[in-house]
Amino acid sequence: MKKILKIFVFSLLIFSNANAEERNNKLDNLFIELKKTKNLSSAQAIEKEIQEIWLIHPSDNRRGFRLTELLFQGIRLMNGGQLSKAYELFTQIIATEPDWSEAWNKRATVLYLMNQYESSLDDIKITLKLEPRHFGALSGQALNYIELKQYEK
C-alpha cells in the first residue's frame, strides 16, 4: 500500500510539475469548467482533479515532494483514527509551509473530528484566505457551524 501511495504521489507530482502560476492557471480553468458543466459525472471528475492538485505541494522540488509525502502520511493517520498524531504532523507541515492551503484544511478536518470546532473554524478561515474557492473547507465550515448550533452562519 505504501509503495502504491508513493507511486501515486510521484505520478501526481510529475503531472503537476508546474510552477505556481501554471498551477493557478490550471485551477482557474478547472473552476471555469466546473461552473459551466451541466453533467454530474463531468463535474465529479473536475472536482476530483481540483482536489488532486490541492493535495500536491505546489513546489516542484524535493522539499515539495517531502511535504506532499507528509500530508499523505497525515491523511493515513487521520483515516486510521490517530487524530493526535495527524494533528501534530499537519502542524509540522504548516510550520514549514504556512501558505499551503491544503495543510490548513487537513488540520481543520482533524480538529473537527476531535470536536474542537472553534479551532477548526480558525484553520478553515486561513484555508479560505489562501484558497477562497476551497469547496472542502466551505463544507467543513458548514459542518462546524452545525455542531456549534450557529445555523445562521
Positions of PLM-derived features:
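Canonical positions in the second alpha-helix
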Residues: I93, I126-T127
